[in-house]
A protein has these predicted regions:
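Glycine-rich loop at the start of a catalytic domain that most often binds anionic cofactors/ligands
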Residues: 5-19, 93-97
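Glycine-rich phosphate- or other oxyanion-binding loops that anchor nucleotides, phosphorylated ligands
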Residues: 20-166
Length: 166
């Protein structure tokens, strides 16, 4: 997400692919998004890192926006961590605080689950009773606090943009 480009220096990079090298991969038009898929290790754990993402407001379809996640699923990822910069409506939050999602509200006009269901990617209607893993939330909370960040949990509202989500 915005502001986390320095994380790349923590990766033991084995190889990178430019998005242009990957068939059907969208290319980000947002300044500062370098457009690379990085394969490597962080603390001996294999990772795939997107250096730049695509936004619905750039004119891509929802299927194009989620295509990279689907590719990574086929490559064998079992855990997906996402980050971004967003606005907020909670007056207790300050610029630079970290918010870990415990739920979300989708106000986008389209849904990536529309269209033909691909069974290998999951069910037509995923269980949304607990959309975010509580163990991962707790671990992320502890790590962020240990690094000195003000940490909150909250509900993310996704909007089409172009503006920061809340």
């Amino acid at each position: 997400g915005t502001g986390l480009g320095g994380l790349v220096s923590e990766i033991d990079i084995k190889f990178t692919l430019s998005y242009e090298q990957i068939p059907h991969f969208p290319v980000s038009t947002v300044e500062g998004h370098s457009g690379k898929l990085i394969f490597g290790y962080i603390s001996q754990r294999p990772v795939i890192v997107m250096q730049g993402r695509f936004h619905y407001y750039e004119g891509y379809t929802m299927q194009q926006v989620v295509f990279p996640v689907r590719v990574m699923k086929y490559l064998g990822i079992s855990t997906l961590l996402l980050s971004n910069a967003s606005g907020g409506v909670n007056p207790a939050f300050e610029i630079g605080d970290v918010m870990i999602l415990n739920d979300h509200i989708n106000l986008l006009p389209n849904n990536p689950l529309m269209g033909k269901n691909i069974k290998e990617l999951g069910p037509r209607f995923p269980d949304m009773s607990e959309p975010y893993d509580k163990k991962i939330i707790a671990k992320a909370h502890g790590i962020a606090q240990g690094l000195g960040y003000n940490v909150h949990e909250g509900v993310y509202v996704s909007v089409s943009g172009p503006c920061f989500e809340t």
